[in-house]
Structures are given as C-alpha cells and as structure tokens.
Amino acid sequence: MSSTPDTPSRQPIRALTPIEGRVLGVLKEKQHTVPDTYPLSLNALTAGCNQKTARAPVMNVTEAEVVVAIDGLKGLSLVFEGSSSRVPRFEHNMNRVLGVPSQSAALLAMLLLRGPQTAAELRLNTVRLHAFADISSVEGFLDELAEHEPPYVVKLPRAAGEREHRWMHLLGGEINVDSFAAAGAALADESVAPSELERLRAEQRDLSNRVQRLEALVEHMASQLGIDPDALGA
C-alpha cells in the first residue's frame, strides 16, 4: 500500500504532549492548505493551533507555550527552523522521522487536529492534504499505521448508535481501549434514542463539511488578494 520513505524511519523517543501534537498537525496541514506562507511563523503557527474550526478540542495556547512545544519537537527532529528568513519559520519533518508516506502523514495530522474519526470522515477531512480514491484506500493506510511497531493508530470499539469504527492516533501514548468501550455502553443507557443520536451526528458532519468548504473558499480568495489567511484568524 505505502511507498518506502526516502530515509530510514526513526521513532520518537517519547509520547507527544497535546500541544506538541497540535503544533505538528498544524504544520502538516498548513503545508498543503497555505503553501505560500509555509514554513510558518510563530504567529501563524499559534493562530493555527487556536483555530475555532476543524479542531477538536479547541485550544487557547500562548506563543510561549508553542515555543516550548517547538523545542520539544526539535529534540525529536520532528520540527526544524528554516534559515532563509529573518523571521523564524518552522516546518515539520514528520514523514521521514516517523517513516511513513505522505498519505499516512496526512491521516495522522488530521487525527492530531480533530481527534478520533471514522475512515469516511478522514477521507473527507484530508481531501486538501491528500485525495484518497475511496474509503478502502484510507482503511488500507490506517491498517498499516496500526500494524507499525510501535503502532501509530488504533481502531476504537464502535460506540452505541454508530455504524462505523473510529480511529485514534497513538502519538500521545498508549490508551485504554476498554475505557472507550465502557463509554459506548454508558451512552447506550442515556435517554437519547440511537436514531436521534445518529441524526444529530449527521447534522454535525453536514455542518463540518460546510465549514470546510467555506474555509477553502476564504483561503482561495485570500490567496488571490495576496492576504495571509492566518491574519484573518483562520
């Protein structure tokens, strides 16, 4: 399924903190969505971390906290600072350090930014990073990530009222999968009927899709006008 990376894989020596994971995900995302402003300045990177859309959970981190996260990621060779600009700019080295192809890196970035998602949701949410041909393609790369040693993702137990399994990244460390199963069982005992729950989830997905299309339109218009999208609070 995947192609062999250009260099041998190198494993992170420890689990990432939540802010480190957010920083890494933002760098991978913005590399594709706003290539004209990538590598990112500290200000743009912080704005990307604090986005109110396409983020779960929403964060409110300071530039100082982002700098600490950058330093931690530098120590793992996952991020490095460019030297061709007077303003410090940062870029990721995710593909090579983790030893994964661009398709897998796109999936990991989206899991870092948006939390657990189904294969169908990942296919939709990664479209600007990589256009997967179908859901089976997404699942193929997810399976590879799950079979990696150590594993980079895990398939979660299907929650009550859900038709598909969700996937979660493990770059922040191992998780207790049984706790997710217990949470799903507890959800089944709640007063919200499965059909109503599914309707609410469908509405949420529809709203998320609309927001993504609007974001893409704003970024395109900003690019045409020569405006940095991050300056608009994207």
From Swiss-Prot:
Gene3D superfamilies: Winged helix-like DNA-binding domain superfamily/Winged helix DNA-binding domain. InterPro entries: DUF480, WH-like_DNA-bd_sf, WH_DNA-bd_sf. SUPFAM superfamilies: Winged helix' DNA-binding domain (SSF46785). HAMAP family: UPF0502. Belongs to the UPF0502 family. It comes from the Bacteria. This is UPF0502 protein Reut_B4455. It holds the Pfam family DUF480.
